[in-house]
Curated annotation (Swiss-Prot):
PANTHER family: 60 KDA HEAT SHOCK PROTEIN, MITOCHONDRIAL. It is an enzyme of class 5 (isomerase). Keywords: ATP-binding, Chaperone, Cytoplasm, Isomerase, Nucleotide-binding. One of its GO terms (biological process) is protein refolding. InterPro entries: Chaperonin_Cpn60_CS, Cpn60/GroEL, Cpn60/GroEL/TCP-1, GroEL-like_apical_dom_sf, GROEL-like_equatorial_sf, TCP-1-like_intermed_sf. It comes from Thermoanaerobacter pseudethanolicus (strain ATCC 33223 / 39E). Together with its co-chaperonin GroES, plays an essential role in assisting protein folding. The GroEL-GroES system forms a nano-cage that allows encapsulation of the non-native substrate proteins and provides a physical environment optimized to promote and accelerate protein folding. This is Chaperonin GroEL.
Length: 541
């Protein structure tokens, strides 16, 4: 396919137009008085959102050169979202500011490679400054503040803080769509997996259609059970000791299933059978997790165990097991705390090493099931459009809160970036020539978020920036919601350090790429040839 090429200033200006198209659309959403953007959907209702990355992903430009700039800026938003889960609008805005300032200097004859090194040096200083002013987050109130700021909703903030309080920082918190108008929190204690009873005849509560076993023993095996002879020695021990039995197996069918059901109906013993969770190697790992949590052993021929030789002390134990048609929940597993901790650390190490997002998500789920539990936030709203928007906000707030727990918090409202100007200024003073000019580009960009938050609130950004700088108080800032100057920490206006840091680093990375670009190559658009008119005698469809 033929290509079009643009060089030098012409290429960079085309990229800048693409950058501006994305940034100008995204930046109107910044701050508590930021506006929404309506996204057209081919099918169904339009999406109304103020989430930077969602908006950026929707933008495709007609001009192929400008579109390259737009795609590069999308990369800033997407990468920031992947790493920190929030701060995509800030990242987009910072990148736009750096590109704008950088291109001015290039037009005046600056060396792009020296500018790039200057930008990198200044960003390193700013990141160190952010670490210096960051405060650890350790109480429910601080978590609620972070979540409330991100979601722009106090109720959601409190729900997220409560969810984190219940399941711990390693716990899994998921967001689902509710059928009701309100937004609620549901917490599942213990380990839950998405497999229900194999036969409905195994329920202990016919009204609720669920089986609840108090103090049961748990057989964990990767075998398919169809022959009752394999199970008889174990069942005799279970009946002798008057225990209730939960069987977690690859499958239970045929004669084995029929015998278990008949004995349950006769009242000989209480038994519930469920299929093992997961698939393939993940299934083996999850069975091992359940075994460690309940203090049992996985009965597997690979490990040299035969079902006929199973003793009662090889089975897992728990305070309670609840089995519904779709889920099994094990509460109060009798596993050794040290062994569970060892397993948790092993999974954490795997999370660090994996490069697959899917694997990471599955490992996080396993970690949560071992470490604490699962919380589900049910998002409710009056219309489908509002529901989508609310779910987006909750997911963003959740990601921001996790980032805050990880690396701490800094004053919000763009103030943290103003606070590190002194750190960057020291670097600027130590440099000269185009190296210095590159560092100055970052210096100017650091003011941009405060200016934009103020502009979205309808006030002059430059005046606000100068007032904050003159105050010399690191926590002094502008509350755009109440339209007043205040102590940001006391007012609960905080941002996660990780979000601010990631936004700045990713913005600088893409800006440097654009500034050092000397040519852009794109495909020549194909000409759509119009279909010929149907000839005489042809039927019109």
């Amino acid at each position: 396919m033929a290509k079009q090429i643009k060089y030098g200033e012409e290429a960079r200006r085309a990229l800048e137009r693409g950058v501006n198209a994305v940034a100008d659309t995204v930046k109107v959403t910044l701050g508590p008085r930021g506006r929404n953007v309506v996204l057209d959907k081919k099918y169904g209702s339009p999406t109304v959102t103020n989430d930077g990355v969602t908006i950026a992903r929707e933008i495709e430009l007609e001009d192929p050169f400008e579109n390259q700039g737009a795609q590069l800026l999308k990369e800033v938003a997407t990468k920031t979202n992947d790493v920190a889960g929030d701060g995509t609008t800030t990242a987009t805005l910072l990148a736009q500011a750096m590109v704008r300032e950088g291109l001015k200097n290039l037009a005046a004859g600056a060396n792009p490679m020296l500018l790039r090194r200057g930008i990198a040096k200044a960003v390193d200083a700013a990141v160190e400054g952010l670490k210096r002013i960051s405060k650890p987050i350790d109480n429910k109130e601080s978590i609620a503040h972070v979540a409330s700021i991100s979601a722009a909703d106090e109720e959601i903030g409190n729900l997220i803080a409560e969810a984190m309080d219940k399941v711990g920082k390693d716990g899994v918190i998921t967001v689902e769509e509710s059928k009701t108008l309100g937004t609620t929190l549901e917490v599942v204690e213990g380990m839950q997996f998405d497999r229900g009873y194999i036969s409905p005849y195994m329920v202990t509560d016919a009204e609720k259609m669920e089986a609840v076993l108090e103090e049961p023993v748990i057989l964990i095996t990767d075998k398919k059970l169809s022959n009752i002879q394999d199970l008889l020695p174990l069942l005799e021990q279970v009946v002798q000791h008057g225990k209730k039995l939960l069987i977690i197996a690859d499958d239970v069918e045929g004669e084995a299933l029929a015998t278990l059901v008949v004995n349950k109906l006769r009242g000989t013993f209480t038994c519930v059978a469920v299929k093992a969770p997961g698939f393939g190697d993940r299934r083996k790992e999850m069975l091992q997790d359940i075994a460690i949590l309940t203090g049992g052993q996985v009965i597997s021929e690979e490990l040299g165990y035969d079902l006929k030789d199973v003793r009662l002390d090889m089975l897992g134990r728990a305070r309670q097991v609840k089995v519904t048609k779709e889920n099994t929940t094990i509460v109060g597993g009798a596993g050794d705390a040290a062994e569970i901790k060892k397993r948790v650390n092993q999974i954490k190490a795997q999370i660090e090493e994996t490069t697959s997002d899917y694997d990471r998500e599955k490992l996080q789920e396993r970690l949560a099931k071992l470490a604490g539990g699962v919380a589900v936030i049910q998002a409710g709203a009056a219309t489908e459009t509002e529901l989508k928007e609310k779910k987006h906000r909750i997911e963003d707030a959740l990601a921001a809160t996790k980032a805050a727990v990880e690396e701490g918090i800094v004053p919000g409202g763009g103030i943290a970036l103003l606070n590190v100007i002194e750190d960057v200024q020291k670097v600027v003073d130590s440099l000269d020539g185009d190296f210095k000019t590159g560092a100055k580009i970052v210096l100017r960009a650091l003011e941009e978020p405060v200016r934009q938050i103020a502009a979205n609130a309808g006030v002059d950004g430059s005046v606000i920036v100068e007032k904050i700088k003159a105050a010399k108080d690191p926590n002094f800032g502008y509350d755009a919601y109440k339209e007043e100057f205040t102590d940001m920490f006391k007012a609960g206006i905080v941002d996660p350090t990780k979000v601010t840091r990631t936004a700045l680093q990713n913005a600088a990375s893409i800006a440097s790429m654009i500034l050092t670009t000397e040519a852009v190559v794109v495909d020549v658009p194909e000409k759509n040839t119009a279909m010929p008119n149907p000839g005489a005698g042809m039927d019109m469809m």
